[in-house]
């Protein structure tokens, strides 16, 4: 954790990685695209030297639950500005429950703090908790306005859970690009958008994610750390955004998005694992 925080003020200029360095990754991604009849976008940003590589990095993909990191970052930002109190409570009503709410569905009739709602959102991907946060930060428009404020001109949020997960081809609503969201995560975790205290809180929520054990975490190199957030939606949408680092490796921001495929969830998960393994091999092979 200390190593990650050491880079909290570092946002280097982007330098495009040599094509040869990521040649195998690109070949692997293309092979998976063909095998799943999918559309895939990937971006990799090394925060130490600004080295950047992508595959379909400027194409739009459904945000799905990867928006939750941004929504909770907006809550932290608003708290810094005195616009919201993260310790304020919201009553949980049965009528507000939406699909997949493993934490909130057990607390109907009780109250939850906004801070705890973010914890549930980020660690279990609880959709009702996410809607509670959205309501507190000005809705989808509030999140999109925040993105524009920090320089992200591509990512947009238009709907709440669960509608935002529709994933229909050609629909610009609730989409991002792998390149844009990697840059945004860089600003949120290592830039000046949030205070160091809130950067640590956002990082902690991502580190304690409980629903991604079968994705990048399953092939994380020994001694490495990860902070991540995943998502899934209609028309084969599956995604993950992550920061990985080790004692000797500066944080690397990875975003992987799949869309427009009839592949099963297991097949999509396996695709993310294979792509992640290929990316990690680029960095571990350098230290051999």
Swiss-Prot record:
InterPro entries on file: Beta-lactam/transpept-like, Beta-lactam_cat, Beta-lactam_class-A, Beta-lactam_class-A_AS
UniProt: substrate binding residues: 229-231
GO biological process: beta-lactam antibiotic catabolic process; response to antibiotic
Record's catalysed reaction(s): a beta-lactam + H2O = a substituted beta-amino acid
Entry annotated with the keyword Signal: yes
Alphabetic keyword roster: Antibiotic resistance, Disulfide bond, Hydrolase, Signal, Transposable element
Cystine crosslinks: 72-118
Signal peptide (residue range): 1-17
Single GO MF annotation: beta-lactamase activity
Active site: 65 (acyl-ester intermediate)
EC number(s) from the headed UniProt entry: 3.5.2.6
More details: The class A beta-lactamase family has a specific amino-acid numbering system, sometimes called Ambler or ABL numbering and often misspelt as Amber. A multiple sequence alignment was used to derive a consensus sequence and then the consensus was numbered taking into account insertions and deletions. This allows use of identical numbers, e.g. for active site residues, despite differences in protein length. UniProt always uses natural numbering of residues, hence there appear to be differences in numbering between this entry and some papers.
Annotated function: Hydrolyzes both carbenicillin and oxacillin.
Family the UniProt entry places it in: Belongs to the class-A beta-lactamase family.
Name this polypeptide is given: Beta-lactamase CARB-3
Lineage: Bacteria, Pseudomonadati, Pseudomonadota, Gammaproteobacteria, Pseudomonadales
Gene giving rise to this polypeptide: carB3
